Amino acid sequence: MEHHHLLLQLSPPPPPPPLPAAHLMMSPSFFDAGVFADVGGDWMEDLMHLGELFGVGVGGDDDDNGGVDGGVGGGDDRMQEWQNNCEGAGSPDHQPSCGDGDGDGDGDVSPRDGELGDGDGDNSATRKRRDRSKTIVSERKRRVRMKEKLYELRALVPNITKMDKASIIADAVVYVKDLQAHARKLKEEVAALEEARPIRPPPPSAAAQRPQRQPRRVAAAAAQLARAADAAAVTTAAAAPHGARVAHVGAAQVGEGRFFVTVECEPAAAAARGGGGGVAAPVCAAVESLSCFTVESSTVGCSPDRVVATLTLKVSEAEEDVSAISECTVKLWVMAALLKEGFRPQPTVQIS
């Protein structure tokens, strides 16, 4: 910048035609001897000062013109070399900066090229940082998942010696091997027990035994009913003062070993005038006489012409096979008990 100021001080009064700055500085008109002669003798001092700045010597006093020409010529060559170093081979848009360059065209690049280069570098650096961030995030997620799995494994294994990852995995491996060995041992014991157990024929099921027992019970109840009917036929009216007739006997199974029994009787004329109260007691006494049943509940409803008794019977615990007692067997047993108490069967009695 100091060189430019010194050159501008030596410019002639009439301004030259407009030219680029580089051509203006190197124009020969600046070193015209006639022009300097008009200015005065101060131009020699200025020229010598420029020669010292550019390393150019000025001629002696014997040959002023030759010295001036030689000095100017040497200065012109040095100026040309300096201009070439400053201008370079590129266009003004890509002109390198002057000053610290060493004359080989390797000076600082222009701001535009620098900006482009910095942009490319920034993009590459940003891309690298983004890839590195993705890698770090993925690795962090993988470690979090691994840590969660290790926590779950530590909760399942009962004997954990240490809390570090290697100890947790080693203890889990030992625990799984122990479980496998225990399972093999149990299988061997089961196989040995199966071989030592004697083979026995399966016992007959209750369903298979029921058809054999039930006919015998039904036959026994029928025989008992026949005997009770024969005894009732020879009984006199004095032996049965109520003189009631059995109109209907019904039974329904309401659970295992439990039956719902209904008895309908038609009282005689004397018992009907008394409201049927003399028939309810013999009905309950007849049912209670059955030793294989227990009366859980009973209800008696009386009307002038009919007495209806409803009872809930449960098979006693003394009976071995409760499933062998059917509804038909219960009806026959209740009917036989009523006949023993002096009830007379109607010709159209219903047993259902």
Swiss-Prot record:
Keywords: DNA-binding, Nucleus, Stress response, Transcription, Transcription regulation. Disruption phenotype: No visible phenotype under normal growth conditions, but mutant plants exhibit impaired growth, leaf chlorosis and reduced iron concentration in shoots, when grown under iron deficiency conditions. One of its GO terms (molecular function) is DNA-binding transcription factor activity. GO terms for biological process: regulation of DNA-templated transcription. It is found in: Nucleus. Residues 144-179 are annotated as: Helix-loop-helix motif. This is Transcription factor BHLH156. The lineage of its organism: Eukaryota, Viridiplantae, Streptophyta, Embryophyta, Tracheophyta.
